[in-house]
């Protein structure tokens, strides 16, 4: 699959190292990027973040045939929340059978803040987050339960202060993109 605008499905070599055809266009929409393809219950699903980071939404399409035709549904948008974008995420399922959608929002100097939203399936499409404004499109939840997974990880609060005693920056000093190391020192 490829495309940052139109979405194409390609045949690939068995080892996944090269394309074997020019691809078949299966969708064209506004600023489609970060597309994901998966199969569930006999359907091919294409998850597409559309419309750009600031005001975008998440579309999910499904078809019994990988080349379509596809049914399309907007499944997540900013709506009445303050989470812009909900953008460039992915649907994931846990070993316990729960479904989740992780995505980011653009938070200017804080960079791209990651969110995790609960998912339920209704009529063959994911319902992501909560439909606060009752328009049949999910919206990001500010607070939700955490995934019910078996895990032996001790939770840690984020570090919020630094005495700069180390020769390396602590985790709270992560950079939005590529750090300009020449602009700081310890």
Task: Please give the residue ranges for each predicted region.
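Carbohydrate-active catalytic/glycan-binding domains of CAZyme proteins
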Residues: 1-186
